[in-house]
């Protein structure tokens, strides 16, 4: 599978971040519902990209950043 990294970084990541912000406002950033959504959606997107290492590492960075924000 050839991956369009430009599309991934310019569309997929920003769209996911926007949905993440919306979800955190809906259910609360610290809620189990939010974190389940985070893990589920990250997993789904990574699978769409056949768990490509750059994709999974990027989402790993985002997940770690979110955890730090949560305190």
Predicted ranges, named:
Residues 1, 68-71:
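Short intrinsically disordered terminal tails
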Residues 1-29:
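N-terminal acidic leader/helix
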Residues 2-5, 9, 35, 55, ...:
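Short runs of predominantly hydrophobic/aromatic residues within well-ordered alpha helices
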Residues 24-32, 52-56:
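Short, surface-exposed loop/turn segments at secondary-structure junctions
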Residues 30-49:
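Amphipathic, non-membrane alpha-helical rod segments
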Residues 46-68:
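Short, charged early-sequence alpha-helical segments and their helix-coil boundaries
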């Amino acid at each position: 599978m050839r991956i369009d990294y430009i599309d991934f970084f310019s569309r997929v990541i920003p769209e996911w971040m926007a949905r993440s912000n919306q979800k955190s406002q809906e259910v609360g950033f610290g809620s189990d519902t939010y974190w389940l959504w985070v893990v589920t959606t990250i997993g789904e997107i990574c699978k769409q990209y056949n768990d490509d290492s750059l994709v999974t590492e990027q989402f790993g960075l985002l997940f770690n950043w979110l955890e730090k924000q949560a305190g």
